[in-house]
């Protein structure tokens, strides 16, 4: 797995799975650009890591000029772009009959349209360079339906099909596109959602959530980051259009 000096851009890289991916790629001596809407958290990450291979760009991925700027910043800072990891995402809990249109649009804009915009401008550079690799964070919710998050499920179903479409369209240009479908991962975002939408202590809720899969535990962000490392490396060179499910066996039931 030789990722030394490869340039990797990660959206939503300031926390959770994204931050685990940042650390994983830095450990492989890659150059990492983080595009995240949380400027304070991004700057705190830069201070904590204190690594010349790490660069932060404040980015709202629902804004096309901001996406263009993020891609340009990666190329300007490190001289190229080898891997785009579309990881940023949000979740709003509400059944269809109670969901506001504004919240529906917000979830779709971040989870799906933002991925389209980042990919669009990354592909323009990758086509010129004659190679590239895009990794999308999908979800088990893109394969089966989690209860009470229809907008999230719909957006992730779209991510799965967008991944396949790009893989088919750009394989002839030496650009691979794959996605990872995590199950329930122990992240700050999920912890917040657990407390807002369930009764009990955080520890009690986590124990209950862990019962849904055969491994009887929540996933770790690092475990998803390891899948991303594999997809970014030549170890997965014959893979494109694939969806790797990392869910503790949930969808095998």
UniProtKB/Swiss-Prot annotation:
Disulphide-bridged cysteine pairs: none
User: What does the entry list as the binding residues for substrate?
Assistant: 139
Report the pathway entry.
Antibiotic biosynthesis; bacilysin biosynthesis
Task: Write down the InterPro entries for this protein, in alphabetical order.
Answer: NAD(P)-bd_dom_sf (IPR036291), Sc_DH/Rdtase_CS (IPR020904), SDR_fam (IPR002347)
Binding site residues for NAD(+): 9-31
CDD domains linked: SDR_c
Q: Sum up the protein's function in the record's words.
A: Part of the bacABCDEFG operon responsible for the biosynthesis of bacilysin, an irreversible inactivator of the glutaminase domain of glucosamine synthetase. Catalyzes the dehydrogenation of the C7-hydroxyl group in the 4S-tetrahydrotyrosine (4S-H4Tyr) to yield anticapsin (epoxycyclohexanonyl-Ala).
NCBIfam families assigned: anticapsin_BacC, PRK07231.1
Q: What is this protein called?
A: Dihydroanticapsin 7-dehydrogenase
What organism is this sequence from?
Answer: Bacillus subtilis
């Amino acid at each position: 797995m030789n990722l030394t000096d490869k340039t990797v851009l990660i959206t939503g890289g300031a926390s959770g799975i994204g931050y685990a991916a940042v650390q994983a790629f830095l450990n492989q001596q890659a150059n990492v650009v983080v595009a995240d809407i949380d400027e304070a958290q991004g700057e705190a990450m830069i201070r904590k890591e204190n690594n010349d291979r790490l660069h932060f760009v404040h980015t709202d991925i629902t804004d096309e000029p901001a996406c263009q700027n993020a891609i340009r910043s990666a190329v300007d800072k490190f001289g190229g772009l080898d891997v785009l990891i579309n990881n940023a995402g949000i979740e709003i809990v509400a059944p269809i009959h109670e969901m506001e249109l504004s919240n529906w649009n917000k979830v779709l804009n971040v989870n799906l349209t933002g991925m389209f915009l980042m990919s669009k401008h990354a592909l323009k550079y990758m086509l010129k360079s004659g190679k590239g690799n895009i990794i999308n964070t999908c979800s088990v919710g893109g394969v089966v339906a989690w209860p009470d998050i229809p907008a999230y499920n719909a957006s992730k179903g779209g991510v799965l099909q967008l991944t396949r479409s790009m893989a088919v369209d750009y394989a002839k240009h030496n650009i691979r596109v794959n996605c990872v479908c995590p199950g329930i991962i122990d992240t700050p975002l999920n912890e917040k959602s657990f407390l807002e939408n369930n009764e009990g202590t955080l520890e009690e809720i986590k124990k209950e959530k862990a019962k849904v899969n055969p491994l009887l535990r929540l996933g770790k962000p690092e475990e998803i980051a390891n899948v991303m490392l594999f997809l970014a490396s030549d170890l997965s060179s014959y893979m494109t259009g694939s969806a790797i499910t990392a869910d503790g066996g949930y969808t095998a039931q």
